[in-house]
Structures are given as structure tokens and as C-alpha cells.
């Protein structure tokens, strides 16, 4: 038994109840107290409860206001001294922080007004007031907080406002209330932690006391590799696709020609998506060869320039050299285009999917990265319709735990009709977009040589969005990139997409 544990038992024997360990043992920190109490509780010597008290301390700025007065009082006194004050001169005379906050709060309190000359002057209610008798509420409340006096009487809104203004900082004091346990005494017998063969053979265990198992304690963390959350969710998606009869497409070609990334998908060469601000172009090498399929190339040229297969085209001069430029693929539909072109050699119903990285030259923020993962599914069959697409989307997302979908018409260059897919998000209490879908255009499919009655459904969604929702990640940079915490990777649980993903 430690000296501190013995001190606690003696004080408890003297008082019957220790109402505040903070007051009784001020020289010991809360962690030392908690450790000693837990040890004594394991011996049934005592019981204790934790009491947390919220505290507030003045920041450097708050202490300055306490000593010098609030910004609004400084402004009012300056206006009284000068008579009037040009608004443009407030910042230069008082500084940007004092001027901005002081003006706002003085107007709010009704202490100042703006005249016809765009000057600040004292309001009517302060015209004949001695400013020394004017109550500086901000300063008074800060003094009250510093003295820890009647904090319960301060309105919560006022405290929140002071915190937002960074005039006070919230803290916490941990205290404990201690009472006697069922086996209380000031003597402490050491508890055995292991049952040995000698104890059993000599029956010595009958006279010993053993430390009870603590089933609530954390085990030692095993040092081992761990799967990234994106890999876990990716594997869930793969299993959903496999269970629905899909085959995975090869997706390891990150660099594509503009032909497969844009032209084969019926995206015109003047489309904004092909601009430098949206697409990463490869510097070395700059270009690559085009497909050897001359009929296919002629069809693409014709369908862009004057139209074919029921289309009037885009009516522009299509340039083969534009197709040869190398880019980091902006979507995984480039993979689908290659696979569908191969399918044209032996047309038949098929189901394909891919999950891999794509790249966009766009601003990075909490929900967008220049590099992310796209989940894409492609289903080809004879004489299927938009109704089949809707039904299939409902079945696909139901396996992810997402039901009650809504579909909204949208525009994609390579699908028509096209639909955005929305689901109700219980946490956000609103409909959120979870995917994009459509039927690939005849201009794209028939150019490849696919028969007219073989139609293709396609849809895609981000891998990051469901992962962020599942793991409650607010900033995508904490999920992917150099800011990811290794502790987060090692401790996150497995993901099951069929368990209320969007709730």
C-alpha cells in the first residue's frame, strides 16, 4: 500500500465521507487521486464518484479588457472627447480589432449613432450621461469570472459569446466524492494476481485474496499492420458487385489519352472539362498513339463533326492531335470505354465494375481532393430501358443499406437519359447526392461497333463519401493524404455497408 492510499483510508475513517478530494488532498493531482482510488476500490475498501466542474479563465485579450475597459467603452469615450468621429478614422485611431468590435457592440447597445455626414456621435440616450457612471458589462463579467464569483448567475449565451470572442477559455476541474466500501478498514492486504500450482497443491489459495478481473480495461494494443478504411469499404463494394454477378475491370492505367478519356465518350474537344484548370496533362511524353481501329476512328470523327446514329453531332472540326494528348484520367469511365470497345468484337450481355483512383485539377478543401477514388458499374444487355436502370440502382444501393432513393434528371455528355441519385441523410436531415447514372449514348456505343439493341447502363459514385459518413470523418484530408493519423488507421473497426450507411 502506498503512503497516499493509507492517507486516504485514514481520512475516510476520520470523516466517514470525503466530499471533495480536491479540498482534502490539494497537493495531489486528479490522476494520482484516481489511480489511488481505483486501487482501493479493487480491494472493496471504498466507493467513489467523479464530479467534473466547468471553469473559465481569462485569455490575454480578456485580461487586457479587464484592466483597460471594453472596446465599446473606449470608442464611446473617444467620440465624447472628439465630438464626432469619421467612420474611416475609427480603425486608425483605435486599431482594427478595437475599432471593428467596439463599433459593432456600441451600436448594439444603442450608445452611438451615425449622422448625415457619415460620422459617429453619441446617441441621444448618452448625450447627458457621465461616461464614468456607464456600466461596462463586458469588463464586469470578466471580473466576475476572474474572481470565480457567482458564475451560475451568468447567462450561458454571454459565456458562449465571450468564448467566441476568445476573451475566456473553458477548462475543467475533476473532483471525487468518496464513501466507505463493504470491506472498509485501514489495513490493506495485498491481492494475488495469479493462481499458481503451488497454491493449489498446498491449498494455500483458500486463505488468499485474489484481485478480480477487470473486464472493462483495454488490452495491450498489438503492433501490427492495419487496413486503411478506404480499403475496407472498397472491399465491401467489391463483394456487393461480385454477389450481383459483376466482373472487375483492369484499372491500373492511370494515364490515358484524351481519346479514351474524352473523345470516345462523346465529349467535345471544346468542353470545359478538358481545360487545364480541370485536367492534369502529362508533360513528358506529351502524346501517345491512337487506336488502330480505323473504322472506329472514322466513326468518332464523323459523330463529333456532323453526327451519326441519330445525332447531328457538335458541328466542329475534330482534331486527331487533340486526342493524342496524355492526361491523368479524370474518371474511370475511360476504363469502361476500352472494355466496351473490346465487347464490340463479341457482343453479349455483361456486367463490369472498377474501383480505383481518378484525378481532377481542382481546389482542395474539406470535401474535395485532386486525387480520389471512383466506384463505377457498367451493365450491358439487350433492349433494357431507363426503368431497368432505376430498378437496378434501387437493388444495388439497398445492398449498401441505402433505401428510399430519389432520381433527378441531369446532363452528362456520354449518357442520355442521365440521372443523379439522392438518398435521405438522417444525420444531416436532407437529401444528399450519392451517385450519378445514365444510359450510354448511341453515339458512343454504335461508334464502337456494338449492335443497336445492346444497351448499356452506367453509374458511379465516390468511394470517399460513404467512407467519411461511415467513419464520421468531417475532413477528407484526414482520410486520404499526408495528414491521416496512423492511430485512426490502426484503431478503426471493420465497415459493413449494409448497416444504415446514411443514418
UniProtKB/Swiss-Prot annotation:
GO CC aspect terms: cytoplasm; phenylalanine-tRNA ligase complex
Enzyme type, top EC level: ligase
Enzyme nomenclature, EC number: 6.1.1.20
Entries under CDD domains matching the protein: PheRS_alpha_core
Sorted UniProt keywords: Acetylation, Aminoacyl-tRNA synthetase, ATP-binding, Cytoplasm, Ligase, Magnesium, Metal-binding, Nucleotide-binding, Protein biosynthesis
Contains the major tRNA-Phe binding sites: region residues: 2-173
InterPro entries, sorted: aa-tRNA-synth_II (IPR006195), aa-tRNA-synth_II/BPL/LPL (IPR045864), Phe-tRNA-synth_IIc_asu (IPR004529), Phenylalanyl-tRNA_Synthase (IPR002319), PheRS_DBD2 (IPR040586), PheRS_DBD3 (IPR040725)
Swiss-Prot/TrEMBL catalytic activity: tRNA(Phe) + L-phenylalanine + ATP = L-phenylalanyl-tRNA(Phe) + AMP + diphosphate + H(+)
Residues that coordinate or bind L-phenylalanine: 333, 374-376, 414, 440
Binding, Mg(2+): 416
Residue list for modification N-acetylserine: 2
Molecular-function GO terms, alphabetical: aminoacyl-tRNA deacylase activity; ATP binding; magnesium ion binding; phenylalanine-tRNA ligase activity; tRNA binding
GO BP annotations listed: phenylalanyl-tRNA aminoacylation
Cofactor(s), names only, from the UniProt record: Mg(2+)
Subcellular location: Cytoplasm
Main location: cytoplasm
Complex formation: Tetramer of two alpha and two beta subunits.
Record family assignment: Belongs to the class-II aminoacyl-tRNA synthetase family. Phe-tRNA synthetase alpha subunit type 2 subfamily.
Protein name: Phenylalanine--tRNA ligase alpha subunit
Organism: Saccharomyces cerevisiae (strain ATCC 204508 / S288c) (Baker's yeast)
Amino acid at each position: 500500500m502506498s503512503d497516499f492510499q493509507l492517507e486516504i483510508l485514514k481520512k475516510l475513517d476520520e470523516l466517514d465521507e470525503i466530499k471533495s478530494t480536491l479540498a482534502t488532498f490539494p497537493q495531489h493531482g486528479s490522476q494520482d487521486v484516481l489511480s489511488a482510488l481505483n486501487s482501493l476500490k479493487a480491494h472493496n475498501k471504498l466507493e467513489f464518484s467523479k464530479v467534473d466542474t466547468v471553469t473559465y479563465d481569462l485569455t490575454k485579450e480578456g485580461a487586457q479588457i479587464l484592466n483597460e475597459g471594453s472596446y465599446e467603452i473606449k470608442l464611446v469615450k473617444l467620440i465624447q472627447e472628439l465630438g464626432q468621429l469619421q467612420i474611416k478614422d475609427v480603425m486608425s485611431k483605435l486599431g482594427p480589432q478595437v475599432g471593428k468590435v467596439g463599433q459593432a457592440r456600441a451600436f448594439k447597445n444603442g450608445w452611438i449613432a451615425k449622422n448625415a455626414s457619415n460620422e459617429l456621435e453619441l446617441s441621444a440616450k448618452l448625450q447627458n450621461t457621465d461616461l464614468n457612471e456607464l456600466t461596462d458589462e463586458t469588463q464586469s463579467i470578466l471580473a466576475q469570472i476572474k474572481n470565480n464569483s457567482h458564475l451560475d448567475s451568468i447567462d450561458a449565451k454571454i459565456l458562449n459569446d465571450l468564448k467566441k470572442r476568445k476573451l475566456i477559455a473553458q477548462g475543467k476541474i475533476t473532483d471525487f466524492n468518496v464513501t466507505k466500501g463493504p470491506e472498509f478498514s485501514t489495513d490493506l492486504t495485498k491481492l494475488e494476481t495469479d493462481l499458481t500450482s503451488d497454491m493449489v497443491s498446498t491449498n494455500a489459495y483458500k486463505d488468499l485474496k485474489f484481485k478480480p478481473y477487470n473486464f472493462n480495461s483495454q488490452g495491450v494494443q498489438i503492433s501490427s499492420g492495419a487496413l486503411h478504411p478506404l480499403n475496407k469499404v472498397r472491399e465491401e463494394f467489391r463483394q456487393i458487385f461480385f454477389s450481383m454477378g459483376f466482373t472487375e475491370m483492369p484499372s491500373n492505367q492511370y494515364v490515358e489519352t484524351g481519346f479514351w478519356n474524352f473523345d470516345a465518350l462523346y465529349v467535345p474537344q471544346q468542353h470545359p472539362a478538358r481545360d487545364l484548370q480541370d485536367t492534369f496533362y502529362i508533360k513528358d511524353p506529351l502524346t501517345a498513339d491512337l487506336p488502330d481501329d480505323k473504322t472506329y476512328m472514322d466513326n468518332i470523327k464523323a459523330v463529333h463533326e456532323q453526327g451519326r446514329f441519330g445525332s447531328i453531332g457538335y458541328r466542329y472540326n475534330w482534331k486527331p492531335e487533340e486526342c493524342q494528348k496524355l492526361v491523368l484520367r479524370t474518371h474511370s469511365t475511360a476504363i469502361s470505354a476500352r472494355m466496351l470497345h473490346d465487347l464490340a468484337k463479341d457482343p453479349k450481355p455483361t456486367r463490369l465494375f472498377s474501383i480505383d483512383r481518378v484525378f481532377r485539377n481542382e481546389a482542395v478543401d474539406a470535401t474535395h481532393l485532386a486525387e480520389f477514388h471512383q466506384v463505377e458499374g457498367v451493365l450491358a444487355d439487350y433492349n433494357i430501358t431507363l426503368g431497368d436502370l432505376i430498378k437496378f440502382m434501387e437493388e444495388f444501393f439497398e445492398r449498401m443499406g441505402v433505401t428510399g432513393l430519389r432520381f433527378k434528371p441531369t446532363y452528362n455528355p456520354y449518357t442520355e437519359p442521365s440521372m443523379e441519385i439522392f438518398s435521405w441523410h438522417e444525420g444531416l436531415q436532407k437529401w444528399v447526392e450519392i451517385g450519378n447514372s445514365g444510359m450510354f449514348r448511341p453515339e458512343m456505343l454504335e461508334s464502337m461497333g456494338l449492335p443497336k439493341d445492346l444497351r448499356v447502363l452506367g453509374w458511379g459514385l465516390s468511394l470517399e463519401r460513404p467512407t467519411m459518413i461511415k467513419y464520421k470523418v468531417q475532413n477528407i484530408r484526414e482520410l486520404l493524404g499526408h495528414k491521416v493519423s496512423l492511430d485512426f488507421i490502426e484503431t478503426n473497426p471493420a465497415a459493413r455497408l449494409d448497416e444504415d450507411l446514411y443514418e
